[in-house]
Amino acid sequence: MNFAEAVRRAGVEFLRDEPLAKHTTFRIGGPAEWFAAAATLEQLETLAEVALAYGVPLTVLGGGSNLLVSDAGIRGLVVANQTRRHGPAAQFREQLQHPALRDDHWVAESGVMLAGMARTTTRSGLAGLEWAISIPGTVAGAVIGNAGAHGSDTAANLAWVLVRYPGCRRQVLTRDDLHYTYRSSRLREQLLGPREQKRPVILAAGFALAQGDPVVLLHRADENLARRRASQPVEPSAGSIFRNPAGDFAGRLIESLGMKGHQIGGAQVSPRHANFIVNT
């Protein structure tokens, strides 16, 4: 049985040479050698194991933000993570059995869009993710890169993350296990490591959220969203390009150099916010 047959046996259809420009917020990127979509955690895990068994490089693609894909594309298997379930822990008891799963946790599969989950939890009167209502990307991306805005970040409310290293069993890592720093984590370091090193596949995450007043929380979230819309570009981009240095802002530094609005080809330093490069 060859690789293509093994993927089909997993119940997943695949494409050859799929343009990744269709799957990134930058709207650029060459072809994926193999491309498949995982709608369930089981499919995601199976595809990771198939790739390992056949020695095919694996890349898991979330929302396509914070990502720059070469015109040469990506070799191996690119899996679009389309797992979308999230809700109170009780809904996941049968699927995710682990002592770290507490009744008061909000659980999300890794492909859940962060902004949509933040809107749902905020409307439900659960405090902690109001900052994320304007953030593109998935839960997995937020967990890996410690996404944040408006004075908070993912690490502030993350309780645990469920991962699988291909060839191994599922593991639950606590927030302390992830060694969070500004826009980074142990998971990010592992994913940026050498290809021969086993890289984690993020499956799900649990968030500890406090009870709050939905009206107050929604007002705060909407203020964050309005502030973002007023200050950030609407053109295709990967989001903020550079991390802020201590005590300053990357956008301010770039603007002070006179680079705001500078353009080469179709790439432009956004005239609205200098820490964004937009695809014109």
Enumerate the language-model features and the residues they cover:
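Structural signature of FAD isoalloxazine-binding scaffolds in flavoprotein oxidoreductases
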Residues: 29, 36-41, 68-92, 144-175, ...
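Short acidic (Asp/Glu) patches
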Residues: 63, 145-147, 181-184
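Anion-binding (especially nucleotide phosphate/pyrophosphate-binding) glycine-rich loop
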Residues: 2-139
